[in-house]
Amino acid sequence: WRMVYDNNVNTIVMLTKAREGNEEQSAIYWPSDIGEQMNMKSITVTLVSDETDGPALKRKLKIERGAISRTVTQLHYTGWNSTSCPEDGRDVIELVNKMQENIRSTGDGVALI
């Protein structure tokens, strides 16, 4: 989260499921319940909202460091298995479009993929 905060990241794109079957594919690095907080040293992350937006789950996260807070959007695409590629590329194109829309709507931010 320090890298996200220090580099003014406003959009995170995650392209894998957290779990496939019994295997962990990625650590869950965000709070799971709305209003829940995760504290990592000097940074607090709070889940503000969680909804389905086209091919992705869209999470709004508030990152606080001291008195400064920022909003980060995570677009979590779960249609890409670790052993294959998406059957329909249109979902990936829609995801890229949603990422670009989010970057434009929030100003001078950076995307982390």
Curated annotation (Swiss-Prot):
Domain Tyrosine-protein phosphatase per the UniProt entry, residue ranges: 1-113
Lineage: superkingdom: Eukaryota
GO MF annotations in UniProt: protein tyrosine phosphatase activity
Record keyword Hydrolase present: yes
Swiss-Prot/TrEMBL catalytic activity: O-phospho-L-tyrosyl-[protein] + H2O = L-tyrosyl-[protein] + phosphate
Enzyme class: hydrolase
SUPFAM superfamilies attached to this UniProt entry: (Phosphotyrosine protein) phosphatases II
Keywords on record: Hydrolase, Protein phosphatase
Keyword hit for Hydrolase: yes
Gene3D superfamilies: Protein tyrosine phosphatase superfamily
This enzyme's EC code(s): 3.1.3.48
Stored Pfam families: Y_phosphatase (PF00102)
Family recorded in the similarity comment: Belongs to the protein-tyrosine phosphatase family.
Protein name: Tyrosine-protein phosphatase 15
Biological source species: Styela plicata (Wrinkled sea squirt)
Lineage: Eukaryota, Metazoa, Chordata, Tunicata, Ascidiacea
